[in-house]
Amino acid sequence: MEAFKEKVERLFQKHEELITRKNVAVEDGNGIFTRYKYPVVTAAHTPVFWRYDLDEKSNPYLMERIGMNATMNSGAIKWNGKYLMVVRVEGADRKSFFAVAESPNGIDNFRFWDYPITMPEDAIPATNVYDMRLTAHEDGWIYGIFCAERHDDNAPAGDLSSATATAAIARTKDLKNWERLPDLKTKSQQRNVVLHPEFV
């Protein structure tokens, strides 16, 4: 039977091979965009130590403890010479969190930062957050606008899946420390919002 340490090393080796795999264009493109063979970020790109308890005593069979279902709908920005995405990472429980993945070229070699984003709550806590869009604003802040989903209090008793959606707003200077601002107030549920990078 393969030793625990060797299994861990193999997990990290496979992960590194995935992250450093060169992406290749699959068609000439139309001059506007180029399609590539591999998705730039998948659930398998999330760090091994997010998904696995690497302690042999508490996880002797090296079972994945925190399942990652998918990565999707990222907001992207070129910042300090790197391509960064705030990725929606969906867990096996279908709840999402945000994490930053960084690449030198925006095509491959996307590597997640060590820790997911810790997003402060609004006055009314959200049951789920997703689909952040980033804007580097002329005021010096990077703004993230995303969907904050909350339980719908008008749903019938026992209905735990009905939800309301609002455009939540947060800002940061470093993509690590975030300040939560009040949600955008609208008459109807609105989460598809654009913030211009300069004052109009």
Located regions from the model:
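Beta-rich carbohydrate-recognition and catalytic domains
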Residues: 1-73, 77-127, 135-200
